[in-house]
Amino acid sequence: MTTPLQLAAATTAMARRGNFIEPHFSLLEDVDAGAPVPIGESMDWERMIDAMEDVLHGERGTARGAARGLNYRIAGKTGTAQIVSIGQEEEYDAAELEERLRDHALFVGFAPADSPSIVVALIIENGGSGGTTAAPVARKIFDYWLLDRNEGSRPPNTNYVATINQRVLEPKHADSN
């Protein structure tokens, strides 16, 4: 089991091309985070980051829908954590499960990909797919941080997750009628 903070710390090391910085909480933007600890070779990090960019910007990326209309590049990874085992001959149908048994949606990423200023790691409990649920929420956070925050706008609405869940789960349920 990994916490969102651990995911954020690992993603920060990726964004910094292998320079790990111990995570800390602060209300300030400019804080001395201590000396970075180098990990691995730069070429290896670039290959991984290219693959993470393809998750959002590649033709077959699992979060390509969340990147539509972007004027900056995000590097990210989606994930889906299964809560209950599904038999080999069975098919997963979220609409048929109690909400508490639905898959968790995960996303980790950073932006802009070439010169990161923000890392996002989120887990949406019982949210379904990381690409269709968590990545769009992360996109809202990235947009706020990179585009809107200096214009005095408010952070993304937390009801956005409920809206996504409705959009993702209701069509499947309607098809079964």
Descriptions of predicted regions:
Residues D30-S42, A162-P171:
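Short, mixed-charge aromatic SLiMs
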Residues M1-P36, M43, M52, L56-G152:
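Active-site beta-strand/loop architecture of penicillin-binding DD-peptidases
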Residues D148-N177:
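Gram-negative outer-membrane assembly/targeting C-terminal domains
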